[in-house]
């Protein structure tokens, strides 16, 4: 019988020490970059070893360096500023008292979510280089070969960091896909698998596009898939690419 390899969606719990510094960085408060780099490297080593110890085959870095799976992009690209409007999901709109209870609970972390207010350009490539180096180093220390790094899709970025600059959302998606292509290509060129987080094909239906018809949403979804295909066109066909479509209890890997 062939072995069925095990993996997961990528993001894993950060240590309290790491979380505190990531939030300070996210809020533009003072932090020590050298200390942050050291903690990330140490925590990646720990989380890689833990995954291997429990029997996971395809290992991730746990996204230790990222404040969230989508909004980390604001730190790697020029063109974001201000703060975006927070949209409650449609299913919560239907139950306002419950929505109010959730909002008051304080259980959901508040990340900085700016808008796109200028032409997008690459700002920081060092963070990705460090992510790749940390994961490959940890894999080597633990005599393991297969690992993957998560990267946000153009569509999910546009959901959390909305367009306030480009003529229309199509132009914004095209610009995002050009920027993210660099990240996708770099991950796969370094012999790592790529997992693209794209819940925009489901999550955005009841957030960004909650007030449009099904027909209008399908047009938007087609454009997002088109841009994602363009961004991944140069990835070697022998490389595995997985796409996480849902942020609900079930995650579909294609």
Predicted regions and their residues:
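Conserved small/polar residues in nucleotide/adenosyl-binding loops
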Residues: 244-250
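Class II aminoacyl-tRNA synthetase catalytic cores and aaRS-like
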Residues: 1-11
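Conserved, mostly hydrophobic/aromatic
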Residues: 4, 51, 149, 187, ...
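TRNA-binding/sensing appendages of the translation machinery
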Residues: 29-70
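Acidic, glycine-rich loop-and-beta core segments that form the ion-binding/anion-interacting portion
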Residues: 213-241
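Alpha-helical packing segments of well-folded alpha/beta enzyme cores
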Residues: 36-48, 131-135, 176-184, 224-231
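Active-site-proximal, glycine-rich beta->alpha crossover segments in alpha/beta enzymes
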Residues: 9, 13-28, 81-219
């Amino acid at each position: 019988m062939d072995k069925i390899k095990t993996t997961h969606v990528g993001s894993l719990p950060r240590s309290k020490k790491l979380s505190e510094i990531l939030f300070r960085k996210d809020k533009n408060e003072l932090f020590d970059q050298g200390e942050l780099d050291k903690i990330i490297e140490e925590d990646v080593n720990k989380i890689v070893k833990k995954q291997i110890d429990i029997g996971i085959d395809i290992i991730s870095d746990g996204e230790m360096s990222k404040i969230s799976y989508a909004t980390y992009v604001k730190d790697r690209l020029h063109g974001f500023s201000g703060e975006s409007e927070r949209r409650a999901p449609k299913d919560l709109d239907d139950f306002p008292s419950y929505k109010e209870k959730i909002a008051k609970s304080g259980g959901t972390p508040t990340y900085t979510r700016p808008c796109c207010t200028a032409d997008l350009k690459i700002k920081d490539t060092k963070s990705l280089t460090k992510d790749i180096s940390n994961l490959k180093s940890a894999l080597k220390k633990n005599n393991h070969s297969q690992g993957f790094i998560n990267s946000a899709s153009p569509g999910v970025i546009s959901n959390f960091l909305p367009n306030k600059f480009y003529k229309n959302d199509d132009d914004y998606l095209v610009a995002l896909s050009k920027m993210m292509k660099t990240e996708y290509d770099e991950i796969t060129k370094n012999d790592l698998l790529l997992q693209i987080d794209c819940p925009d094909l489901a999550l955005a239906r009841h957030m960004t596009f909650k007030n449009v018809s099904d027909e209008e949403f399908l047009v938007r979804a087609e454009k997002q898939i088109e841009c994602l295909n363009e961004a991944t066109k140069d990835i070697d066909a022998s490389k595995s690419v997985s796409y996480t479509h849902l942020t609900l209890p079930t995650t579909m890997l294609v």
